Amino acid sequence: HTNDRRQRQMCIRDSLSLAQVDVDNLLSVRANFCSARVNYRRQRGGGKGQMIAKAVGLSSSTAPNVFDATAGLGGDAFVLASLGCPVTMTERVPEVHALLTDGLCLAHEWGSENDQSLVAILKRMALVGSDAAKYMQTIEDAKKPEVVYLDPMFPQRTKSARVKKEMQVFHQLIAKDSDANLLLQIALECAQKRVVVKRPRIAPYLAGLEPNYKLEGKSNRYDVYLCH
């Protein structure tokens, strides 16, 4: 169904996609864990030397369990799972939650027939619900994650063609995460070892809270808050 933001969900080639209908083009996104791009990153993406791996504390001997409170299409969770981390995910936007559920199911089906290593990765990923704040507040102390990972939506600064298509679609679907500051506070109380916040490189600190340290790339950075 098309709503006032001209968004709709539609089936394309037997997979669920979210589409933005414009006058000149059609942008669509889906959760795809079987693409050549995803496989390339699995094989040659830098392994445990990637910034996200360093940010969560992954090492040759340690693969922490991670709670991804803002899973989106599952891209970062998949990277961490491919490196050995058990990842529990939540995604609160119903349309995006549906895309992620569909993508995981299709990947399991495809992997069962074509790639058992993909199945092994997917077994380390669990989508448990939609409300991250409530979920974190109900976790028993003994089962709290070592790492909580946050990638809150941030204001779109440009409408240029360089903006990733999924961001164009998502920004039309949902507004800036107005409760991201609260989510950080809950995450700090939930995580056993650290909270990692992914941010645009030049964005202010979430909730104005300076991290213990940060890792910076060309466009993004990871703010790391250590829990004591």
Which residues make up each language-model segment?
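Conserved acidic residues
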Residues: P64, E146, K193
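Conserved Class I SAM-dependent methyltransferase catalytic core
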Residues: A180-L226
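S-adenosyl-L-methionine
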Residues: T90-V147
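SAM-dependent Rossmann-like transferase core, predominantly class I methyltransferases
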Residues: L27-S60
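Single conserved hydrophobic/aromatic residue that forms the stacking wall/gate
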Residues: H1-I12
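Mobile active-site "lid"/loop adjacent to the S-adenosyl-L-methionine
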Residues: P152-L183
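Conserved class I S-adenosyl-L-methionine
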Residues: S61-G72
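Conserved SAM-binding loop of SAM-dependent methyltransferases across substrates and taxa
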Residues: L73-C85
